[in-house]
Amino acid sequence: KRAKALGVHVIDRCNLTVLMEEGFEDTAAFLAENNVEVIASMPCYLEENVDSQRGKGVFNASIEGLKLLNRKGYGIDGKLQLNLVFNPQGISLPPSQCELEPAYKKELKKRYQISFNNLYTITNMPIKRFGSTLLSKGLFDEYMQLLKVSHSEDNLAGVMCRTTLSVDWQGYVYDCDFNQMLGLAAGLSLDKAAGAATVPDNKT
């Protein structure tokens, strides 16, 4: 609410399974009431693929979360935006966003009557758990080389750190969500931006 009051376009990186957990039943309604754009990870539209990556039951909980968002008006038209994210597994780059999005829309609609607005394909950064996995399998250098040879200056204008900030649950601000994963705060918070507080030195 405070961010919206500042005239900021707010995006919620939503864990779909949380929407169905006890104590969070009103989250979807809150997001809709405040016209918050929702972005959620959905690695596949097939149950066996998702559960093999995220754990048993994650797919069905995610589907129920998407259905709930649809009931609140998300993904139906252009007003309440519901966008999904695809991340590839292993040392590979994501497929064409333009080619994958129609398949997602077709399958989720046919199988579960779910609608969404856009599908974003994101290349994995070799950090945190993914980076550790690459190192343990001896694939880190190979993946870094793949990123290097696949570099395209055409992509630079669209990188999210040029137009967005990430904010964690405590209000700390990061210049991209990858730096948020690494705990590298940008040195300010929503409170500080509003002139109300400062970020502790150990968070800068």
Write out the residue ranges for each language-model feature.
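C-terminal accessory region of radical SAM enzymes
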Residues: 115-147, 178-204
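Short, electropositive alpha-helical surface patch
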Residues: 2-6, 91-109, 143-144
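Core AdoMet radical
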Residues: 1-23, 27-66, 83
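Active-site glycine- and acidic-residue-rich loops that bind
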Residues: 20, 90-101, 150-159
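C-terminal accessory regions of radical SAM enzymes
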Residues: 148-182
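Flexible glycine/acidic-rich beta-alpha junction loops that bind and position SAM and/or redox cofactors
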Residues: 22, 44-53, 81-96, 112-137
